[in-house]
């Protein structure tokens, strides 16, 4: 994580951060309210490094709290309060938050739909909606398409941009057009498991003059890789990270073939954790 985060910091440092802000669309954490000392330290370092570079705004994600018990405190509140950085802002609840010439409209998962804002509540030049959750038509890495119409793209009509977190796959749900905002999932920074692809992880750099963006892929020397052997033939390895956790589907290979395959892979990959079927 630290290696990837440092790469992110380097990417940010290469840009002109004058009059820029950083938006984190939820899921800073992973284990909801189960906070280990290592997690607290790493998350603290991460948020401080972002806030040192530009004003940083965070919204809550489903992994930052226990949605099944709303009486519990979310994990971001004590973390942000403890850091107490003047450039770090937690936009916990739904509402309009004005930053310079931009209104950030937060659709918080902690609040009911009735309390969600509208573009009509915005008074600034730029109108940006922030949401964490599934949106109808979005696709996961497992090729599952969100069919729940609880939140549709049309909900955000009237905004200039909609920045969404939750699904770990970069995707553009809608291009900007008159009355219709650009709606984008920025992806997660880091691949989390074998169910996600190695690529399409990173961040989006937005131009507030044109409401256009560039996806900035975040290189990672660590990752998960699935190798599938079909009819005894091993496919050519592509995009394998230097440090890999490899899952192997051996198909019809016998035990001798499996051992030989693992031996070859172990010498080819710096670090590997093999699990095969």
Q: At which residue positions do the language-model features occur?
A:
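Core catalytic region of metal-dependent phosphoesterases/phosphodiesterases
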Residues: 1-96, 155
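Accessory, non-catalytic peripheral segments of nucleic-acid enzymes
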Residues: 17, 208-277
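Conserved acidic residues
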Residues: 20-22, 125-127, 160
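Structural beta-sheet core signal
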Residues: 24, 58, 129, 247-248
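Active-site glycine-centered loops adjacent to acidic/histidine catalytic or metal-binding residues
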Residues: 26-27, 61-62, 132, 165-166, ...
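Short, conserved loop/helix-junction motifs that constitute active-site signature segments
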Residues: 48-52, 120-123, 153-158, 176-179, ...
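Conserved catalytic scaffold of divalent metal-dependent phosphoesterases
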Residues: 64-154, 182, 186-188
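Conserved beta-sheet core of the metallophosphoesterase superfamily
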Residues: 141-213
């Amino acid at each position: 994580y630290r290696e990837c985060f440092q790469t992110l910091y380097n990417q940010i440092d290469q840009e002109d951060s004058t009059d820029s802000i950083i938006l984190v669309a939820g899921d800073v954490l992973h284990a909801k309210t189960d906070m280990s000392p290592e997690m607290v330290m790493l998350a603290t370092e991460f948020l401080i490094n972002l806030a040192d570079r530009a004003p940083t705004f965070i919204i809550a994600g489903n992994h930052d709290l226990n949605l099944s018990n709303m009486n519990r405190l979310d994990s971001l509140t004590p973390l942000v309060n403890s850091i107490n950085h003047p450039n770090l802002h937690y936009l916990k609840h739904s509402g309009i938050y004005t930053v310079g010439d931009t209104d950030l409209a937060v659709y918080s998962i902690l609040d009911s739909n009735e309390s969600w804002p509208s573009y009509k509540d915005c008074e600034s030049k730029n109108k940006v909606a922030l949401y964490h959750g599934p949106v109808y038509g979005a696709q996961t890495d497992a090729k599952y398409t969100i069919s729940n119409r609880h939140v549709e793209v049309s909900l955000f009509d009237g905004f200039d941009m909609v920045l969404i977190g939750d699904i770990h796959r970069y995707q553009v749900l809608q291009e900007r057009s008159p009355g219709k905002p650009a709606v984008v999932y920025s992806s997660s920074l880091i691949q989390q498991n074998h169910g996600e692809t190695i690529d399409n992880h990173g961040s989006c750099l937005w131009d507030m003059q044109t409401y256009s963006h560039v996806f900035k892929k975040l290189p990672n020397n660590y990752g998960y890789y699935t190798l599938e052997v079909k009819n005894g033939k091993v496919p050519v390895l592509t995009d394998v990270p230097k440090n890999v956790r490899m899952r192997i589907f051996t198909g019809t290979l016998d035990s001798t073939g499996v051992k030989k395959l693992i031996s070859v892979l172990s010498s080819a990959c710096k670090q590997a954790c093999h699990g095969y079927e």
